[in-house]
Amino acid sequence: MQVSVENTSALERRMTIAVPAERVENEVNKRLQQTAKRAKIAGFRPGKVPMTVIRQRFEADARQEAFGDLVQASFYEAIVEQKLNPAGAPAVEPKSFEKGKDLEFVAIFEVFPEFTVAGLESIKVERLSAEVADSDLDNMLEVLRKQNTRFEAVERAAQNDDQVNIDFVGKVDGEAFAGGSAKGTLLVLGSGRMIPGFEEGLVGAKAGEERVVNVTFPEDYQNLDLAGKAAEFTITVNSVSAPVLPELNEAFFAQFGIKESTLEGFRAEVRKNMERELRQAIKTKVKNQVMDGLLAANPIEVPKALLENEVNRLRVQAVQQFGGNIKPEQLPVELFEEQAKRRVVLGLIVAEVVKQFELKPDDAKVREMIEEMASAYQEPEQVIAWYYKNDQQLNEVRSVVLEEQVVDTVLQKATVTDKSVSYEEAVKPAEAPAAAE
């Protein structure tokens, strides 16, 4: 078998392969012999059909099958021989497939980039440290209470944080517009759910009162037909309800699946959850900085096939997450290209770090991570057992642990600065990660 390879770009390869005619004919004859054993042709007993008849009837199909199989087999042999690592399926261009001649074809494909991870010493990481103070715990309990607020009807004027039940009709230039009217809408004043001026116009209103509120749609309003236009809303207030925060009692604790009947026990459970979230937030911020540093220090080209596959994965995820009657391929590629490129590049870099430093998932760290996740459940031992009985779930944890080991490896060489901050600052969502260049 003859093989020649041309580098048509940094990652693209144009491989010409010639398979000897003898091998081609052997493959064709093998298929014809198999066909002869099962062929049913009038006038002949099964298995006794002359080969000349078999060739007349089936040689074209046998040759086509042989072509497909030989292309696949010889391509694999060629990339092994040439020590190439394709990043996707090849585009095949037949050149010669005549009877009695060598099978010749061209395979065009991309290879994975070859590189060594560098610049670890140039990476700078700020590692935060924080504690859950009593004041942080108090604030969290108030947040939990507010999340479970109920509303009771009152006979007074509405104020911010009250919930009003309203009917409204909106008009622009004296004409009602689509989506501008509703009945029985529940609205918490001050929530910012409606356009500016709408909620403010209801402060001081009482049940049974009708108000006319004049507003202007924002210039960046999603409905371009309404953006920047003045509107008049006629609003009828059906009822006004005041917020009532729940008491910190056993019934409230039970809503969170916590069996504790005392405030002290509940606070301890909430603190434990906050500390777990704090550890995860700090770990995530460190990881993001490490990954950003790896990206900046290792600019590499991305095979188009990998990028396309990742874009398609993100499209499918978007449809699954947001629903709607839309097919993934209808979503614009541009929406996902930046994220897809970052994920692909990081995937290649992380894989190279694993290879370069000969990393393997640490079983003790795998167990530690599973125990950490299980601690959030009422029956942690059952959760731990479930993970170890499910290979897919266990392998996912092993992958996460391996990625953490990559981060730890980088941190050993990077410049790390420790900084003490408040709980609120530590758990505050990080800024969007940098894109791959």
UniProtKB/Swiss-Prot annotation:
PROSITE patterns: FKBP_PPIASE. The keyword Signal does not apply. Keywords: Cell cycle, Cell division, Chaperone, Cytoplasm, Isomerase, Rotamase. Disulfide bonds: none annotated. One of its GO terms (molecular function) is peptidyl-prolyl cis-trans isomerase activity. It is found in: Cytoplasm. It holds the Pfam family Trigger_N. It comes from the Bacteria. The keyword RNA-binding does not apply. It catalyses: [protein]-peptidylproline (omega=180) = [protein]-peptidylproline (omega=0). One of its GO terms (biological process) is chaperone-mediated protein folding. SUPFAM superfamilies: FKBP-like, Triger factor/SurA peptide-binding domain-like, Trigger factor ribosome-binding domain. Its EC number is 5.2.1.8. InterPro entries: PPIase_dom_sf, PPIase_FKBP_dom, Trig_fac, Trigger_fac_C, Trigger_fac_C_sf, Trigger_fac_ribosome-bd_bac, Trigger_fac_ribosome-bd_sf, Trigger_fact/SurA_dom_sf. Consists of 3 domains; the N-terminus binds the ribosome, the middle domain has PPIase activity, while the C-terminus has intrinsic chaperone activity on its own. Belongs to the FKBP-type PPIase family. Tig subfamily. HAMAP family: Trigger_factor_Tig (MF_00303). This is Trigger factor. It comes from Pseudomonas putida (strain ATCC 700007 / DSM 6899 / JCM 31910 / BCRC 17059 / LMG 24140 / F1).
